[in-house]
Amino acid sequence: MTLTTMNILLAFFFSLLGTLIFRSHLMSTLLCLEGMMLSLFIMTTITALDTQSMVMYTIPITTLVFAACEAAVGLALLTMVSNTYGTDHVQNLNLLQC
């Protein structure tokens, strides 16, 4: 395992740990999820460059598409919860259930 791969895996696991620790605030959780998506993007890009397969070149772009969709939905949810309740606590999301 190279040093670059180890650093990317550590970044992913620290973002995962941050998601578990800061799960009470939606903004912190969204930032940690973005860190996870960034490390996944870098890892898939490195893997695509190492394998030099034409099929693998589409995976990093697909990862970016999913990250953009996740960020848009997260920001919309954060804006709605902040405007409605005045805070970004995740416990307020239980009130949004049907």
UniProtKB/Swiss-Prot annotation:
Its EC number is 7.1.1.2. The keyword Transport applies. Keywords: Electron transport, Membrane, Mitochondrion, Mitochondrion inner membrane, NAD, Respiratory chain, Translocase, Transmembrane, Transmembrane helix, Transport, Ubiquinone. The chain crosses the membrane at residues 2-22, 29-49, 61-81. It comes from the Eukaryota. One of its GO terms (molecular function) is NADH dehydrogenase (ubiquinone) activity. Core subunit of respiratory chain NADH dehydrogenase (Complex I) which is composed of 45 different subunits. Core subunit of the mitochondrial membrane respiratory chain NADH dehydrogenase (Complex I) which catalyzes electron transfer from NADH through the respiratory chain, using ubiquinone as an electron acceptor. Part of the enzyme membrane arm which is embedded in the lipid bilayer and involved in proton translocation. This is NADH-ubiquinone oxidoreductase chain 4L. It comes from Oxymycterus rufus (Red hocicudo). The gene is MT-ND4L.
